[in-house]
Swiss-Prot record:
GO molecular function: acetylcholine receptor inhibitor activity; ion channel regulator activity; toxin activity
Subcellular location: Secreted
Keywords: Acetylcholine receptor inhibiting toxin, Disulfide bond, Ion channel impairing toxin, Neurotoxin, Postsynaptic neurotoxin, Secreted, Toxin
Chief site of localization: secreted
Family: Belongs to the three-finger toxin family. Long-chain subfamily. Type II alpha-neurotoxin sub-subfamily.
InterPro entries (UniProt xref): Snake_toxin-like_sf
Tissue: Expressed by the venom gland.
Any Gene Ontology CC annotation: extracellular region
Disulfide pairings: 3-20, 26-30
Chain's role: Binds to muscular nicotinic acetylcholine receptor (nAChR) and inhibits acetylcholine from binding to the receptor, thereby potently impairing neuromuscular transmission. Pseudo-irreversibly inhibits the nAChR through competitive antagonism. In contrast to other long-chain alpha-neurotoxins, lacks affinity for neuronal alpha-7 nicotinic acetylcholine receptor.
Protein's recorded name: Alpha-elapitoxin-Aa2a
Length: 35
């Protein structure tokens, strides 16, 4: 699942990261929550 960094929906996060609950940004914590 593609999740997005910041509020720019054109910038996907690195491969392997999952979509976060807000669907507006992602990071390591977001990845853990998505798994």
């Amino acid at each position: 699942v593609i999740c997005y960094r910041g509020y720019n929906y054109a910038q996907p996060c690195p491969p392997g990261e999952n979509v976060c609950f807000t669907k507006t940004w992602c990071d390591a914590r977001c990845y853990q929550l998505g798994k």
